[in-house]
Structures are given as C-alpha cells and as structure tokens.
C-alpha cells in the first residue's frame, strides 16, 4: 500500500523531533510550563491533591521522587560508566578540562550559598542545591544554536554535566542520608555483591541484573540512604565490554539498556518529575520571599557561582597547561557554556526536596532554582548566539597585552556583569511591584501572560503531612474496646508509628483527658519526649475539652501547647479517692477475715475505719508526687509561667486564662496552627491502631491485648463497673 508524502510528513516530523538533541530539553521545559499553568488554573487543587494521593505505602509524589527518579539515576550511572570506559572520559587528557571545570562549578556555588546562610544551620543544609547542572536543559539550550556552537563545545558541556551528575550522586549518598537501618543496609550490600559477582562471571542477560536492581532499590529505600543511589550502584555493576572506536556498539548489556532507557527517561521520567515538582501558585505571596537568603543563595550560586566557577577553573587549567581549550571554540563561547551550567532545574530541585522538610523552605528553594536557571539559560543563549567561533586562536586571556580581542573580551565581561547586576535589581523591584499590584487587584489567576515576562514567584512544594495521634480518655490501666483508657501499653505502639514517618517534620497530638494514674501519665510523657529526641521531630499538643492533672502532664511533652479558649487546663495537683464500707459487712452479716505479715499491710482498707497515721502516710506520698509534677511543669514551661500563687494548687482554668498564666503557648485549633506553621497545603494524617489480617483492630489506644473477648468482659464485669464509676468521677470534677 502506497502512502502519500502528506500522510508520511507528520510521522517524519515527530521522528525528527524525538531524535533531535534539543527534544529532551524542550519536553522538560514544556512540562514545567504546563505545571505552572495548571497550578494557577481552576484545576490547581486537583493537581496538588493528585500528587498526595496514596498508592500503597507512598504518595504519588514520593513514588515519583523515590522510585521513578531511580530510573533516571540508573541512566545517569550507565552514561557515566560508558563515558569512563569507552567514551569522552576514557583518557585522562579528555577528563582534565571538564573535570576541573566541574569541580569549580560545584565548589564556588556552595561557597556563595554558605556565605549567605552561614548563620542559619537549617538553611545551610541546602548548600549543594546550586551545585548541580541539568544536562537535559543545558544541552537543549545549546542545541537551539545549531551550527553556531562547535561540536567540541557540546562534547565539553555533556562531559562536564555527566561529571556534575556524578558529584551530585556522591553528595546525595554522603550528606543527604537519614538515619541508617543496618539490617536493610547490610541486605543492600549483599545484593550489590550479587550484582558484582554476576558481572565478574560474565553474565550478559539483562533480566537478572534488572531483578537484582529492583531488590537493591527496596533495600536501599528502607535503609535510610536515598533510594536513587540504588540506580547508580546497579548501573555500575552492569557489564560493558570496551569497544574502542565503536561507541555505538549495541552488543553489551550496558549499551542495550542505555539505548532502551534513553527516550523513556527523556520523554517520560524527567518530564513527569518536572511536572510534579514545578507547580507554582501565585496566590498570597509576599515580595520578601525573593530577598530571603535561602532564595538569594541559590539564585546567585547558580547564576554567578556556576559561571565563575566553571569558567575560572577551565581558564586556570588551560593557562597552566593542564588542559587544552575545546577545538574551534572561542573564549566567549566557552564563557557562554559556563553560564549555561547554571541551569540546575532537575537535580537542584531534587536536592532541595532532600534538604528541607518544610513547605516554606522548599518554596524558596524552587524560586531560587527557577530564577537562577532562567537567568542562566537566557544570558547563556544570548551570549552564545552573538559570539563568533574561534575569535581568539591566540588565547586572548593568555596574551592580553598583545591581542586587542583580549581587551575587548575583558571589557565585555565587565559590561556584561554590570548589566546583569542592574537587570537583577530591576527585576526584583518589578516583581515586588507586581506582587503589590496582584494583592490589590485580586488578579492572581490572570497570570499566564505575565509568565513570559516575570520570574515566577512561587513553586508549590509537596505538601507537608503531619501525623496526628489522639490521646482521649482517662489515664488508667485495664481499658477495653468498650471503655478505652490511656496507658503506656495502649499508646506506645501508635506513638512509635507516628514518629516513624521519616518525611514528617513534626507530630501533632490531640489530648482530651481529665487525668488519672500519675505513673502512666509520666510514662506516656517520657515516651513522647524520647521518641521526639530519637527521630528529631517537633511535638505540637492540641487540647480539646480538657487537659487536666495527668492529662496536662502528658501535654507537657509538647514543644508547643495550643488550646481552645473554652478548654479546661491545669489542675496541677494530686488526688486520691476511694470508697469506705466499714459498717456494710456488719449489716449484711458477713465476716471479713484478713491475715497479714506486716503491721501496715492493710493500710486504707475500705472495710476498716480510717486511721490517722494511714492518712498522713498517704499525704506524704501525694506531696512527693506533687513535687515531681511541679518540677516537670517548671522544667518544660521555664520562662513562660506567670506569677500566680494558685498555679500549683490544683485549680484549673479556661484556655484563655491558661495562656495568660503561661500554662499553654496559644489559642487556636490544630488545622489553623499547622497551616500557619507549614503552609496552606499541610495535610493531617490520623494514625490508627494497627489491624490484623481480618481487619480487626490489634491492641492499641485504650485496650489491653485480650480486651475484645466476651468471656473476659464478663469475668471482669465487677471490676469494670467500679472503674467506670471511678472514670465518671474523674470527668465530673471538670463538669464533663
């Protein structure tokens, strides 16, 4: 069957596009632009909600950043190994110039960022963000120049970007690793050893390597090391038989896998990452975000640090004779490529997500990355488009006094950077004015046209999820599923589950308890503080109806305590209560027989009259417990307590008065407080007791392990009725 030229033309156009060098960068740009548009459209909420839709144990955003990006790093590892063994990096002379330039491009941006953020340890964690180069974006921009850019420059940029990626992988593995699980890490090492043995035994089928790579990813993901490192490790174990002079040889497993992954990664994996992480909302932004040291550190690190670091290191290497300048490329063109190295979209955002757990810091990171990358792309492209190839074969920077082009290039650098400074200042002022105009005119959603002229104001980060634990009920042992109570045995498991969420910056605890057993109260308090220290998380406590006596003791575990104005808070005292039946047995004709081997063994027997010495002994115990309670309050509320003589008398107050006395930190509700702290997109995740295979709740909040059996309920019915009466009495003290 014959096809007309018209029917074949669309297919050939698409094929030419997919095969072009610029295709990957253009696709990534389009994905990022689409994310900006969607995030500022009526579909914005659907976009953000979809990213946090849970699929199995992880949200969609985590699947993209932890699993899908492992495939990207697998391809990066394959490219690094191929280039080192059978490509541009196979010989030391070829490695010198891009290697030295890459080192300068990693070190100087990190120094600029550290200088601006040295006094803030939390922000300093992002020192590596401006050190990365996005190979797809940078090569995409360079490819738009066509024949204006000599092939030697493209090889130089590609090689430099690969070494830059290698540095980023090492940085992620060393500096952005969470707490280590040695069993999983050991299993990962064993799996890597299996891959190594297969390589040494000349196993050439890909399937065993791919299966082992998936297993390796699982172990690395659970070990605490970032899961994307598994992709690089697996890539380095896949065999490549060097074939000098035949870089396109497709006989080795590495070549086959690299060829199979190239287009899916370029046109599926990386664009999905860009679309998922480049969503920007322009609503409710302050102009001061652009002036924050975190944003400026990344912006200046990418735009200035990269170009000065890469070009300065390359110039020094060429001047000292360690390397040669790319053939046919002028100094201006080499400087233009150095500017393009400041495009750090994919890898910079990825490191930023690892560096900062909070929504605000991730937002500032993305603003800095986009601004620095955009400036680098525009300025680098314009400079390369205006430059002429091989303008200075005589090395103008080497012989500045002999070549007029050297003087012209020096003047150009001065004018270019002065213009860059003026442009940056002007853009900042324009953005501040635009932000003020948007707030006055409420045109936050009428921005698609401005995207072409203004640097975006906000990248919407993956929303923060805060685990929520409900501690509701009286504090005593022996609770059941029908009558839940609080004790260490019933709360330990659910607390550990909440604090184990490694992505959450804090744990929220809802308390509604009138108190109860002081020992159980202190044990729960201690467990919360120990878990917070172990996992380095903040604890926010929110009081509902009441946090009194032992309930307030548990609330002291919070770094901040928030209550409703009508909540009941306080009752810092100790009470003991029981029933006395000294005349009951006589009336019903029952004789009670008690045998002891100690004179004080029947202290406070409810069937005997009270003794003065027994009451004094009980009050002495109460004073000791009360003193411990007071010490806890003074320690946890140091510098916040008011001067009130009734503070430790056992009185209780409303939330409003408790705030003025320093017993709590503020008034409000959980959702409003957490939105103010972590941003509007914060998500609350209620931690539920674990369920068995048949869906029945396992022992958790308020129940003992055997509390669900009807026979046990019947057997302990008498005790249960007394406990219910005691519990009702505790609640009744506060009118509840």
UniProtKB/Swiss-Prot annotation:
One of its GO terms (biological process) is regulation of pH. It catalyses: Na(+)(in) + 2 H(+)(out) = Na(+)(out) + 2 H(+)(in). Gene3D superfamilies: 2-enoyl-CoA Hydratase, Chain A, domain 1 (3.90.226.10), 6.20.330.10, Na+/H+ antiporter like domain (1.20.1530.10). It is a multi-pass membrane protein. Keywords: Antiport, Cell inner membrane, Cell membrane, Ion transport, Membrane, Sodium, Sodium transport, Transmembrane, Transmembrane helix, Transport. GO terms for cellular component: plasma membrane. It is found in: Cell inner membrane. GO terms for molecular function: peptidase activity; sodium:proton antiporter activity. In the N-terminal section; belongs to the NhaA Na(+)/H(+) (TC 2.A.33) antiporter family. Na(+)/H(+) antiporter that extrudes sodium in exchange for external protons. PANTHER family: NA(+)_H(+) ANTIPORTER NHAA, SODIUM ION/PROTON ANTIPORTER NHAA-RELATED. This is Na(+)/H(+) antiporter NhaA. The lineage of its organism: Bacteria, Pseudomonadati, Pseudomonadota, Alphaproteobacteria, Hyphomicrobiales.
């Amino acid at each position: 069957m014959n096809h007309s030229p018209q029917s074949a033309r669309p297919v050939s156009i698409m094929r030419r596009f997919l095969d072009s060098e610029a295709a990957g960068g253009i696709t990534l740009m389009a994905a990022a632009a689409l994310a900006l548009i969607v995030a500022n459209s009526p579909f914005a909420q659907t976009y953000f909600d979809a990213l946090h839709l849970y699929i199995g144990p992880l949200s969609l955003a985590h699947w993209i950043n932890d699993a899908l990006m492992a495939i990207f790093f697998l391809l990066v590892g394959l490219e690094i190994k191929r280039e080192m063994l059978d490509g541009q990096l196979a010989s030391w002379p070829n490695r010198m110039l891009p290697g030295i330039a890459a080192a300068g491009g990693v070190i100087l941006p990190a120094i600029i960022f550290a200088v601006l953020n040295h006094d803030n340890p939390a922000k300093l964690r992002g020192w590596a963000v401006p050190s990365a180069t996005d190979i797809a974006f940078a090569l995409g921009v360079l490819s738009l120049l066509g024949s204006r850019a000599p092939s030697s420059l493209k090889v130089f940029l590609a090689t430099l970007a690969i070494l830059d990626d290698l540095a980023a992988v090492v940085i992620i593995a060393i500096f952005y690793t969470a707490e280590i699980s040695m069993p999983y890490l050991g299993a990962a090492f064993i799996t890597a050893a299996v891959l190594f043995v297969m390589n040494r035994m000349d196993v050439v089928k890909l399937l065993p390597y791919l299966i082992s790579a998936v297993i390796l990813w699982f172990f690395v993901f659970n070990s605490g090391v970032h899961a994307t490192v598994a992709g690089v490790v697996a890539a380095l174990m896949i065999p490549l038989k060097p074939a000098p002079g035949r870089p396109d040889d497709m006989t080795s497993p590495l070549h086959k896998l690299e060829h199979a992954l190239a287009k899916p990664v370029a046109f599926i994996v990386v664009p999905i990452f860009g679309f998922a992480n480049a969503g920007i909302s322009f609503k409710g932004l302050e102009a001061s975000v652009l002036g924050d040291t975190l944003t400026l550190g990344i912006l200046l690190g990418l735009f200035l640090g990269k170009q000065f670091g890469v070009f300065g290191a390359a110039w020094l290497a060429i001047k000292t004779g360690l390397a040669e300048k790319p053939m046919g490329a002028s100094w201006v063109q080499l400087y233009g490529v150095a500017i393009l190295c400041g495009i750090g979209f994919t890898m910079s955002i990825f490191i930023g997500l690892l560096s900062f757990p909070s929504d605000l810091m991730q937002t500032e990171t993305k603003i800095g990355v986009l601004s620095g990358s955009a400036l680098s792309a525009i300025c680098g492209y314009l400079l390369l488009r205006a430059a002429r190839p091989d303008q200075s074969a005589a090395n103008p920077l080497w012989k500045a006094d002999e070549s007029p082009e050297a003087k012209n290039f020096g003047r150009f650098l001065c004018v270019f950077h002065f213009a860059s400074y003026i442009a940056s200042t002007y853009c900042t002022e324009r953005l501040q004015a635009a932000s003020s105009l948007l707030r006055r005119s409420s045109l936050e959603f009428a921005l698609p046209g401005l995207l072409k002229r203004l640097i975006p104001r906000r990248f919407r980060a993956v929303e923060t999820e805060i685990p929520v634990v409900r501690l509701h009920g009286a504090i005593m042992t022996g609770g059941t599923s029908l009558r839940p109570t609080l004790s260490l045995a019933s709360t330990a498991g659910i607390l550990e589950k909440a604090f184990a969420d490694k992505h959450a910056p804090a744990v929220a605890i809802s308390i509604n308890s009138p108190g109860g057993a002081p020992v159980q109260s202190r044990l729960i308090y201690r467990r919360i503080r120990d878990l917070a220290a172990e996992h380095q998380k903040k604890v926010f406590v929110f009081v509902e109806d009441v946090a009194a006596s032992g309930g307030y003791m548990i609330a002291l575990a919070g770094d901040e305590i928030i209550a409703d104005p009508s909540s009941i808070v306080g009752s810092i005292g100790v009470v003991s209560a029981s029933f006395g039946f000294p005349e009951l047995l006589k009336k019903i004709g029952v004789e009670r027989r008690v045998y002891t081997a100690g004179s004080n063994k029947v202290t406070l027997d409810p069937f005997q009259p009270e003794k003065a010495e027994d009451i004094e002994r009980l009050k002495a115990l109460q004073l000791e417990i009360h003193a411990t309670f007071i010490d806890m309050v003074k320690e946890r509320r140091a510098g916040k307590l008011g001067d009130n003589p009734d503070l430790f008398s056992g009185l209780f107050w409303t939330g409003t008065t408790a705030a003025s006395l320093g017993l709590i930190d503020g008034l409000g509700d959980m959702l409003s407080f957490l939105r103010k702290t972590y941003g509007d997109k914060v998500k609350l995740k209620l931690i539920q007791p674990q369920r068995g295979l048949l869906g029945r709740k396992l022992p958790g909040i308020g129940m003992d392990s055997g509390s669900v059996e009807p026979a046990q309920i019947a057997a302990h019915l008498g005790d249960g009725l007394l406990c219910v009466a005691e519990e009702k009495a505790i609640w009744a003290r506060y009118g509840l």
